[in-house]
């Protein structure tokens, strides 16, 4: 397959006035996670090891939880490292034929190991279960039973969404924007990512707060906005891979979905995607101001992580090799540039997407 050369994408200005921060021990976290991975027989190729490093999980979680104790944050960084590998190998890449069955088989066993790490499970992909079992056992040193339940359920939601995505890949179909908008938070493992953050924090968020409509709306807003931003970062990768394979870009990304649904060109679709992200960010900030005054200390910590997730993910995504090295063998093949804007968007109304419209009225008209 010929290498298609380099490709550049310029993203229109993203509204995000939230400040960024970095964890001071990201280098330490990176060294420890590399040593941890070496302790398992994952049969990694040199290329896969390079991709693990290039994904920069210390930089990802270090931007979400910049003030967390290093030893505890290591748990989340280790999870991120092995799950990005899982995502690359079993979710995103390679022919779709037969992938769904292999993915489902391994995914169900991963969830079971999180629920019951001492359970004996055998089958294809067993090498992936050893690091997951180690994570589950380490997490139990700090986590409450409710936190471990939330963690397992978050992974189940993630894997269900990936199965939905794999169905579209196998059928070479493009989901409707209305469906994609509410599913994207799950295909991006949003809840799983923050479930580990709660375990790292230690304090359990009261369910009456975490399950309240306004906090649920805030959570979905943050996860979806970050995932849509991932679609912006990965758009160059999608175009590069399509050019290399001589095919049309995948229809499983926000920009392509908007392009096909609105029947417009790629520049117009890219602008529409950024406008949508800007409106979601504005709504998140406005709703956060309503929720924050009455939040408990554990919920405040959770909301702080969400506030760091949005700008941190923007910053991380522009530099992570995950998007710059599209096939794992061509470093720097894709360059994505973007700028941040602190001026609120002109349009802050709910978008015409019924599945997410409730974020603008989480109490259903009640005061």
Curated annotation (Swiss-Prot):
Its cofactor is Mg(2+). Binds 2 Mg(2+) ions per subunit. Changing residue 79 to A: Produces only minor amounts of cattleyene. A motif (NXXXSXXXE motif) lies at residues 230-238. It is an enzyme of class 4 (lyase). Its EC number is 4.2.3.225. The keyword Lyase applies. Geranylgeranyl diphosphate binds at residues 184, 237, 322-323. It catalyses: (2E,6E,10E)-geranylgeranyl diphosphate = cattleyene + diphosphate. The Asp-Asp-Xaa-Xaa-Xaa-Asp (DDXXXD) and Asn-Xaa-Xaa-Xaa-Ser-Xaa-Xaa-Xaa-Glu (NSE) motifs are important for the catalytic activity, presumably through binding to Mg(2+). Diterpene synthase that catalyzes the conversion of geranylgeranyl diphosphate (GGPP) to cattleyene. Cannot use geranyl diphosphate (GPP), farnesyl diphosphate (FPP) and geranylfarnesyl diphosphate (GFPP). This is Cattleyene synthase. It comes from Streptantibioticus cattleyicolor (strain ATCC 35852 / DSM 46488 / JCM 4925 / NBRC 14057 / NRRL 8057) (Streptomyces cattleya).
């Amino acid at each position: 397959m010929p290498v298609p050369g380099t490709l550049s994408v310029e993203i229109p200005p993203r509204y995000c006035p939230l400040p960024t921060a970095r964890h001071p021990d990201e280098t330490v976290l990176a060294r420890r996670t590399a040593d941890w991975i070496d302790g398992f027989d994952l049969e990694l190729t040199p290329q896969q090891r390079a991709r693990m490093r290039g994904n920069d999980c210390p930089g990802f979680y270090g931007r979400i939880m910049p003030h967390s104790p290093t030893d505890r944050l290591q748990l989340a960084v280790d999870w991120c490292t092995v799950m990005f590998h899982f995502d690359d190998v079993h979710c995103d890449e390679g022919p779709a034929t037969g992938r769904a069955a292999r993915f489902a088989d391994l995914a169900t066993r991963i969830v079971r190991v999180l629920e019951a790490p001492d359970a004996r499970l055998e089958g294809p992909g067993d090498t992936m279960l050893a690091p997951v079992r180690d994570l589950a056992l380490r997490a139990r040193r700090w986590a409450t039973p409710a936190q471990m339940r939330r963690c397992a359920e978050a992974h189940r939601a993630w894997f269900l969404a990936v199965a939905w995505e794999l169905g579209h890949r196998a059928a070479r179909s493009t989901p409707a924007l209305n469906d994609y908008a509410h599913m994207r938070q799950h295909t991006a493992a949003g809840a799983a990512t923050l479930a580990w953050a709660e375990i790292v924090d230690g304090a359990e968020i009261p369910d009456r707060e975490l399950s309240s409509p306004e906090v649920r709306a805030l959570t979905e807003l943050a996860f979806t906005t970050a995932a849509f931003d991932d679609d912006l970062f990965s758009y160059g990768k999608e175009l590069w891979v399509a050019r290399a394979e001589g095919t049309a870009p995948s229809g499983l990304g926000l920009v392509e979905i908007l392009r096909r649904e609105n029947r417009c060109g790629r520049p117009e679709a890219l602008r529409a995607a950024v406008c949508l992200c800007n409106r979601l960010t504005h709504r998140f900030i406005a709703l956060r101001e309503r929720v924050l005054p009455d939040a408990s200390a554990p919920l405040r910590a959770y909301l702080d992580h969400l506030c760091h997730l949005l700008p941190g993910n923007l910053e991380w995504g522009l530099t992570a090799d995950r998007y710059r090295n599209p096939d794992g063998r061509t470093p720097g093949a894709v360059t994505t540039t973007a700028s941040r804007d602190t001026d609120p968007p002109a349009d802050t109304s709910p978008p015409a997407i019924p599945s997410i419209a409730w974020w603008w009225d989480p109490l259903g008209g009640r005061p």
